[in-house]
Amino acid sequence: GSTGLISFGRT
């Protein structure tokens, strides 16, 4: 996903 906290939810 994206960089940051969003990436944790969109691996």
Curated annotation (Swiss-Prot):
The modification Threonine amide is found at residue 11. It is found in: Secreted. Expressed in abdominal perisympathetic organs and abdominal ganglia. GO terms for cellular component: extracellular region. One of its GO terms (biological process) is neuropeptide signaling pathway. Its main location: secreted. It holds the Pfam family Periviscerokin. Keywords: Amidation, Neuropeptide, Secreted. Mediates visceral muscle contractile activity (myotropic activity). Belongs to the periviscerokinin family. This is Periviscerokinin-1.
